Amino acid sequence: RILPVIGQGNHNAQIMFIGEAPGANEDKTGVPFCGRAGEILNLLLTSVGIKREDVYIANILKDRPPANRKPATEEITACTAYLLRQIAIIEPKIIATLGNYATHFILEKFGVPDSQLGISRLRGKKFPVQDPTTQNPYIIIPLYHPAVAVYNSRSLDELKSDFKIIGEQLKSAGDNL
């Protein structure tokens, strides 16, 4: 571990993006989504008229797992309270989960049935939830992780389509960033 990656963005954001864990670039800079996946995330945000500085970005884990392995249960446990506190402080209207792992984790934390379905079945759907502790309402929208487009350029169109759902949700709520 070089630097912890706590999170970054607007503390009054209407949208909070949550990924799994920092990668190598993030570990070096302390900035979430600053590598190739971050470039794609920026492109996707721009495609729906959202500025990166208007959102908040975090990961479940705050440190990169060694050798990019899946997070261990102990690591998740150590970071869960911090992430839930970040969500409560930011109070976003939308929580956009990036990838299978973050989607399963967040949907399960908020008690959503079928939270273990694959991301291809959950992506782009809206799950209205309420935080049992703070009573804050959120809409969770699972999305493919932007890194998918690094390995499969055809998936960029699916990602853009999913990001349109976020833009539409903001407009329907009367919130323009």
Map each language-model feature to its residues.
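A polyanion-binding, active-site-adjacent surface
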Residues: 1-177
